């Protein structure tokens, strides 16, 4: 299934951040029920200037709308919710 964002929006696959305690216990980000703040752009509308497919973007933790496509979760972000691109 192909998803094409409309308007100034992008489709982002969230990047899970793994945290480790001082004693070496690994705590996945989803254990704290907070969304990661960066992800990979999988699709971008023509109006979404400044970001391209494959870019790693940083966004506010609670930005966007979560959707499921083919049993994977993605985030649809408005362009103005993207804080920057990691190069």
Curated annotation (Swiss-Prot):
One of its GO terms (molecular function) is ATP binding. It comes from the Bacteria. SMART domains: Cpn10 (SM00883). Pfam families: Cpn10. InterPro entries: Chaperonin_GroES, Chaperonin_GroES_sf, GroES-like_sf. GO terms for cellular component: cytoplasm. GO terms for biological process: chaperone cofactor-dependent protein refolding. This is Co-chaperonin GroES. It comes from Campylobacter fetus subsp. fetus (strain 82-40). The lineage of its organism: Bacteria, Pseudomonadati, Campylobacterota, Epsilonproteobacteria, Campylobacterales.
